[in-house]
Amino acid sequence: MAAKQVLFSDEARAKMLDGVNTLANAVKVTLGPKGRNVVLDKSFGAPTITKDGVSVAKEIELEDKFENMGAQIVKEVASKTADVAGDGTTTATVLAQALLTEGLKAVAAGINPMDLKRGIDKATARLVEELKALSKPCSDPKSIEQVGTISANSDATVGKLIADAMAKVGKEGVITVEEGKGFEDELDVVEGMQFDRGYLSPYFATNQENMTTDLENPYILIVDKKISNIRDLLPILEGVSKSGRALLIIAEDVESEALATLVVNNMRGVVKVCAVKAPGFGDRRKAMLEDIATLTGATFVSEDLSMKLEETNMEHLGTASRVQVTKDNTTIIDGAGEKEAIAKRINVIKANIAEANSDYDREKLQERLAKLSGGVAVIKVGAVTEAEMKEKKDRVDDALHATRAAVEEGIVAGGGVALIRAQKALDGLTGENDDQNHGIALLRKAIEAPLRQIVSNAGGESSVVVNQVKANQGNYGYNAANDTYGDMVEMGILDPTKVTRSALQHAASIAGLMITTEAMIGEIKEAAPAMPMGGGMGGMPGMI
């Protein structure tokens, strides 16, 4: 086991603060409408230019191990805020730095760190309640557009794209961000339910030019097994043939002999049919097949549910107004499932999302929810260069997360004003002793830091602006984009309540832990052994 170095008290806290300041100073230059970019060196490819706080924080590793500990702890604030709210990482970092700087000064002056932390925790709980009281619902397209615009660094086109996407697929719908192929931003909306499985044979294609299969008002059979014997399908095929309608088969697989029979019957015009593989794998496949069955009004044919393929008849088939199948995707439009059954299924998925432990599971459940409840919107980001593309895609991602957070918990006045207005909730709040009171006063001052940083990044005098904002009431604040004062909500400068709340809670939590740190332990790097000298080369005869 390698030897360890131990730092105590003021020496440990000073090192930790140096690391925090290095990281926070790099992150906070990105805050506000006049925040600057940060260039990140990459081990391969061109450098990345970004204005995304969490991207900057993730890149920082310091040489001094004790300073690096401080930086990594504050990096956790940014990452956690991004995970929970999707935005607000820079605000969280600025708050953590302000709290820690003032907190360590107080500890050095002899204030008890544990009571200081208790005071901060007490004040944080009161501020969170006040932020929720100040919050207003965000449901109309204009508010959604404004939140998206602010989070995308005042880019109105991005705000409008997100508002349009939400209007088309609903607030529960899946909206994804991809790199586009052109210079302009685009919005593509996939109506109905789409899954990434295409036809099992190109001979099912009805449109030879586009190689697509278009089925109007088809029957839909959903099976959770491989179809190997065509005899199992005969009752269904005969019934569909008599009806004169088409049939879409969704199964785990269709083996070669059965597939060949289906292709031949399709080409001869005996029955118009198309077979596709079921989407997903394992339990997720079964869940997705049940979703499709609910959407189309079909009975899910599964041996787990004591149903065999050979026992199925026309009553077990679902329908949809239209189905389009390509070599890669299948889209079911306007399924004939009962609205009550679909709503019930949606509620089950929502409950599963609430209980999901991993981000991956949550994302997949969210996709299933969207496919059942409306569709999928894809925002394709356009740019001239690859560097601009990456930077813009980060901003659009931030804006999308912010608008989702706004829809979930509502909005408050932006530009740091909500935190200033929440200060009044601390009036009359007292702790059990003077040291706790100092913690409350410390947080009251620290929550001015985001507004001060926005003003500093815009080249203004922060104390003058903060005093001007505090002298007024309501949504009155400072618009750093054009150096004016006014009603922040009317000017469209809004922050999601969830983002502001998460930033405050995570910053206060981490700062409290760091203030109460008394020792730091790090590994001592062993000096690399010197290289041995190489042996001399023997001379050759006859050489001088």
Curated annotation (Swiss-Prot):
It is an enzyme of class 5 (isomerase). One of its GO terms (molecular function) is ATP binding. The keyword Electron transport does not apply. SUPFAM superfamilies: GroEL apical domain-like, GroEL equatorial domain-like, GroEL-intermediate domain like. One of its GO terms (biological process) is protein refolding. It comes from the Bacteria. Keywords: ATP-binding, Chaperone, Cytoplasm, Isomerase, Nucleotide-binding. ATP binds at residues 30-33, 51, 87-91, 415, 479-481, 495. The keyword Nucleus does not apply. Pfam families: Cpn60_TCP1 (PF00118). It is found in: Cytoplasm. Its EC number is 5.6.1.7. It catalyses: ATP + H2O + a folded polypeptide = ADP + phosphate + an unfolded polypeptide. PANTHER family: 60 KDA HEAT SHOCK PROTEIN, MITOCHONDRIAL. Forms a cylinder of 14 subunits composed of two heptameric rings stacked back-to-back. Interacts with the co-chaperonin GroES. Together with its co-chaperonin GroES, plays an essential role in assisting protein folding. The GroEL-GroES system forms a nano-cage that allows encapsulation of the non-native substrate proteins and provides a physical environment optimized to promote and accelerate protein folding. This is Chaperonin GroEL. It comes from Francisella tularensis subsp. mediasiatica (strain FSC147).
